[in-house]
């Protein structure tokens, strides 16, 4: 699929490239989203210096990919040296860090160029080597889909092995538009594994490696993927098919909602940092131009006018009404990518047990505000809520303002 999406041009990306570079020079690499925080979190404290160095190195858009790639190569070199010396834990850690950095270096590549494919291969190699040394079972997951396969990684809690028929509860963890499956399970102290919950970190249609593999975003594709993924998970002897939930972050909140609407076997759905505006006008026309360009790549469009028509299909309306399982929505009061009113309207439309939790002053990426520190931590809240659903604990349909 080399060059399959080459030639993406958007008016604002072209006209405002100089502005993006100047904003990055003034504000830094996290101008549009707290990416270095999001990527640092699953790595833990040893990687802090990596991200601090990247923040210093990046002064313009073109610096982003090389900055992450350089750190990835250094970490991969350290991992191989540790492996040769028999230092398994050090090798494990460094392969994980390298995979995260390689994945991050792919983000600016909005086409399946030879460079993007090379970075993707390096990412997979490092994460596969991490999986060999991990402190829990990790295996590559390929879910058959339309003659191809959706890419993921299956994680079992420590102490469990494939085929042991332990009937674990499990979640399908869906990343956001700019997120990737490798960062959805922490190197240590993961919130799901620590609760005895297995995790399928899998990229659905259009997301990261699925886009590389030529599987584009569309509402019908996500509806079909919901059943494909559930069939795969339900067939695993280690997992309890009655206790499989779906959770999505950022644009994964929209995808997760579609999944719950079209596959009733998922027993619960929890979403956070919402992208629930029908048509996605705010994120594509008022936020950083990079969001629109990225999603055009994800959906396989090169013509902006055709993509604008396609965006009209990106809605939960006519789908969310079908959800019958418990639904949690965690949102920021000041979400700049998807105004809170759209999450409010979705919750009013749902015909299932539901709960909305709004964090005061929080922007799209819920957290980094006093309410997220003084109240329940957003990601912890989601994990505890889903765990409670696995064990059938009742809850009152409520709207919390934290």
Task: Tell me what each language-model feature is.
Residues 66-68, 72-75, 117-166:
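N-terminal cap/lid segment of alpha/beta-hydrolase-fold proteins
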Residues 237-250:
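Alpha/beta-hydrolase fold nucleophile elbow
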Residues 258-309, 325:
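Hydrolase active-site cap/lid region
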Residues 323-324, 329-331, 335:
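Short beta-strand/loop motif that positions the catalytic acidic residue
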Residues 347-366:
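Catalytic histidine neighborhood in serine/cysteine hydrolases
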Residues 371-402:
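Catalytic active-site module of serine/aspartate enzymes centered on a nucleophile-bearing elbow/loop
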């Amino acid at each position: 699929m080399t060059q399959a999406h080459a030639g993406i041009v958007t008016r604002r990306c072209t006209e405002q490239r100089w502005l993006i570079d100047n904003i990055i020079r003034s504000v830094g690499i996290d101008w549009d989203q707290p990416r270095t925080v999001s990527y640092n979190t699953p790595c833990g404290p040893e990687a802090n210096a990596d991200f601090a160095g990247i923040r210093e190195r990046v002064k313009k858009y073109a610096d982003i990919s090389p900055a992450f790639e350089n750190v990835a190569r250094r970490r991969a070199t350290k991992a191989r040296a540790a492996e040769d010396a028999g230092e398994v834990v050090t090798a494990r850690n460094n392969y994980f860090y390298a995979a995260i950095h390689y994945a991050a270096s792919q983000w600016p590549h909005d086409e399946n160029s030879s460079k993007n494919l090379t970075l993707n291969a390096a990412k997979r190699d490092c994460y596969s080597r991490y999986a060999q040394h991990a402190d829990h079972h990790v295996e590559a997951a390929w879910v058959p889909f339309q003659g191809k396969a959706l890419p993921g990684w299956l994680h079992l809690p420590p102490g469990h092995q494939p085929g042991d028929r332990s009937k674990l509860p499990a979640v399908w963890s869906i990343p956001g538009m700019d997120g990737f499956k490798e960062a959805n399970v922490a190197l240590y102290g993961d919130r799901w594994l620590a609760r005895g919950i297995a995790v399928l970190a899998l990229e659905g249609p259009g997301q990261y490696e699925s886009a590389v593999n030529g599987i584009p975003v569309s509402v019908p594709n996500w509806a079909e993927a919901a059943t494909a993924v559930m069939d795969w998970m339900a067939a695993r002897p280690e997992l309890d098919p009655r206790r499989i939930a779906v959770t999505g972050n950022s644009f994964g909140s929209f995808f997760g909602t579609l999944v719950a609407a079209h596959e009733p076997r998922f027993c619960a759905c929890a979403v956070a940092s919402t992208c629930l505006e029908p048509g996605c006008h705010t994120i594509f026309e008022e936020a950083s131009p990079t969001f629109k360009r990225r999603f055009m790549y994800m959906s396989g469009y090169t013509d902006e006018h055709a993509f604008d028509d396609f965006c009209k299909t990106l809605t939960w309306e006519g789908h969310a009404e079908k959800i019958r399982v418990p639904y949690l929505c965690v949102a920021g009061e000041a979400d700049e990518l998807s105004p809170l009113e759209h999450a409010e309207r979705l919750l009013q439309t749902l015909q299932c047990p539901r709960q909305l939790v709004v964090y005061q002053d929080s922007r799209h990426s819920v957290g980094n505000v006093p309410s997220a520190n003084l109240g329940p931590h957003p990601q912890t809240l989601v994990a505890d809520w889903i765990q409670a659903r696995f064990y059938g604990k009742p809850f009152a349909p409520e709207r919390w303002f934290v």
